């Protein structure tokens, strides 16, 4: 099974480096993977960084799985996410931020196992969740800050994030759609460290890039 990880990133090279290293460390390579980065046209720093991935990652093969799409900075980040999603080719689409790191080892195997155990529908239309360390997420809510959709779910819905939401709210909206038709798989064995949101101090002191979003 192939996983398509996609995210937008801008001038956050230390965070992006740590994310990519965490993928390299935790992905089992039993499955296939592609990583698609959305980059702003004026972000020369990140574009140069991506030409030297062999100095960042131990697995040279993973370097060949990383591609980027460059365009003008969008007014609506969700439109950028949808553009990236449309360029993926995997069986499972997984949206991320550049300020997360994977904690769970072999998270791809855990995800496939959950889909096989709980995904009995012939149409394979499913939303798969994940857990993260965000302290500013409402306690007790089942929606994932970083959800996955099967290819069939994404194709049927026609988008990944609703562009009616400029910033916040898209993740909750997506969960509600699939929860309403009982097509949510919890997948809580996949855990991410949301580095810029894992303490209250970080949440109330966003970095320069976050302030511009």
Predicted regions and their residues:
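Short, well-formed alpha-helical segments that are part of the catalytic scaffolds
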Residues: 12-27
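Acidic donor-binding segment of Leloir-type glycosyltransferases
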Residues: 23-70
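A short, glycine-/small-residue-rich helix N-cap motif at loop->alpha-helix starts
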Residues: 72-79, 85, 166-168
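Active-site nucleotide-sugar/metal-binding loop of Leloir-type enzymes
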Residues: 82-92
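Short beta-strand-to-loop acidic/aromatic patch adjacent to the donor-nucleotide binding site
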Residues: 90-101
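Conserved donor-nucleotide/metal-binding helix-loop-beta segment in metal-dependent transferases, i.e.
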Residues: 105-127
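Short beta-strand-to-loop element that shapes/binds the nucleotide-sugar donor at the catalytic cleft/hinge
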Residues: 123-145
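C-terminal catalytic/acceptor-binding lobe
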Residues: 166-213
